[in-house]
């Protein structure tokens, strides 16, 4: 992943990307607050977790930030209640659109205009003790074993 800050750096970035594989994705950079939101649904309820804010001193939340401790994860996120609710509603809607099952996690950037922008959908989010979902589960006052039991029992009923 390369962040290009000036036009003269575009071609070298593209060349570098092609040296890694046959396809290249070019995206606009969106400056803002990065947040992530977990969600699951059963036949009789919807659970949308508190948001986690992702803060890093790196250019963006990359491999080093994620796996080498160069990130601060703040749950619940330090954003307005209105923005939180908007992200949670959007996460629930994405869950339904995808026909998801079990847990998902959706990542967003909230730029200066306050309108959340979808980054990616994680249909198999990390589940280690330090992953986002377990942090959000704890922030919601729940236990992972209860969440997992809920999801598993729903599939058998």
Predicted segments with their positions:
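ATP-dependent carboxylate activation and anion-phosphoryl transfer catalytic cores
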Residues: 80-157
């Amino acid at each position: 992943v390369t962040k290009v800050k000036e036009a003269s750096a575009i071609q070298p970035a593209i060349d570098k990307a092609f040296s890694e594989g046959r396809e290249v994705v070019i995206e606009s950079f969106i400056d803002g607050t990065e947040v992530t939101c977990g969600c699951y649904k059963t036949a009789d309820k919807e659970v949308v977790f508190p948001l986690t804010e992702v803060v890093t001193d790196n250019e963006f939340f990359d491999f080093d930030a994620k796996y080498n401790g160069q990130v601060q994860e703040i749950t619940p996120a330090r954003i307005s209640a209105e923005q939180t609710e908007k992200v949670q509603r959007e996460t629930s809607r994405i869950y339904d659109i995808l026909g998801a099952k079990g847990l998902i996690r959706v990542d967003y950037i909230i730029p200066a205009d306050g309108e959340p922008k979808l980054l990616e959908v994680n249909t198999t989010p990390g589940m280690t003790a330090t992953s986002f979902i377990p942090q959000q589960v704890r922030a919601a006052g729940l236990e992972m074993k209860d969440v997992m039991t809920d999801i598993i029992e729903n599939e058998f009923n």
